[in-house]
Amino acid sequence: MRASIPSLLFRCKRSGRLTLMALALLGQARATELPLFLGAPLPAVTSNMAHVACLPPTDPLELAVWRVTTAGGRPDLSCGNAFVEYQRLPRSSSAPVDAFDQIAAQIREAKSEVLLASMEWHAGEGRPGWTVALAVRDLYARVQANPAAYPQGMSVRLMLGNFPDLQRADWATLPLALVRDLRTLGVPLQDAGVGWSLSVLNYRYFPHSHVKLHVIDGRDLTVAGFNFTDTHLPLNERNGGLHDLHDLGLRMTGPVAQDGVAAFDDLWRHSRQVRCPGDVRPEQVGAACTLGDPDRITHPAAATEAVTTGTARAFMLHRRPGVDQADRAHLSLLGAATTQIDLMQATFSPLLTCWYAYLNPDECTYDTLPVYLRAVVDAIGRGVRVRVLMVDYGIDTAANRSGAALVRLMARQLGKEELFEARYTTFAMHTKALAVDGRMVLAGSMNFHFSAWGSLGLAEAALATSDLAAVQQQKASFEDVWANGSRPVPREWWMRNVASGSAATPADLPVSRLSHP
């Protein structure tokens, strides 16, 4: 549904999205399509669902997330999974093969289907998007050389997030740049002779999609926080001040990958697809290609099977406007914590009106906090230790400082300030990961930022698992950064005037005079 500019402003003022909306107003009217009345996402359509039998989990953390992901009778694909690896950026001595090269290797080895979604995309030789384009070229060459090895053909679906675009009225600059790279490398969109089908899509709504995930053959799922952008590369002439940006993706195999397919399909259903003449040359892409309705959703038969690969529990979480599953799962997991929460969150911020609360916190009381910060305060109130790693540069500087200040304030009011610790990383970080009680880890695209939550928040994805190796590896990474790559967030001067223990529980914390006259 489309909406007028005045109505957009009204909605955005009410929801606290005015900053985001300003970007949309710079575009043409036809690019400001709102995601209204989309309906619920469809569940995974798994061809062998009758053979997938997951018993309800007994671990309280698993159970907290499971109750959300299976609500409403949605299929349970949480059992029989296996942790593969974390895909990390940037390249380093501990990660000599970076996530971009790992993903390229996965694409080259695909047997029937590649699904990949990213918000932002930097195309052109030597850039992360080019790494993917080269892998798709190599995959096409393999299919072309030996079609018999791919009896169900090869389907490649690449989806971008409709990131705000000031160059074209249809916001198609990034997907068309991706198509241009593919055509430069000689990759066709269709080659029926060998069963090759390549689609490039762009999410159609504002707010945009922030989802970063890829699924290979319906069996191998990675959910990540990084875009295919130069900021994750070493310093070069393109990335200027922001470079070597740290981030990660969590890779699992097993039935949970089918939930990843369902999340991708939900975005596909709400996207536009690039349409080009069959013989379009690279230099013609911008003028000759257009965006239209997407093809009907189909998958190779082999990519619709849920295949058991291990014994781990894993939970695919997804959200977009009108769908709050990932919100509820995050809150349920945090609400089940009993001992410790470790947050590696680039953003840890309150609502926009409280971004400068570090100067004066009086109007930013417990009841004005966004739900994710309230969940953190509630955990502290239960006696849970909370540690947070965040950044202190760019637009997040004041917001994160205020988020830490407000949580510390309320922890002191609860008489439990010692349970909250916050540190700034000494490097550029884009990570969105958390660990709970040393038994479950979650990673993905979802920031502790108002834009990622609520009825008009971005489309997001996350993956959670209780696999011991996954939990231990993230714990080791967190502890290393905590000890060697961070510095304390200082207490604000006014904290000396805050009495300790003035509230017995979060329910006893002060509330806003404006909302409670």
What annotation goes with each model-predicted range?
Residues T32-P517:
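Charged, low-complexity intrinsically disordered terminal segments
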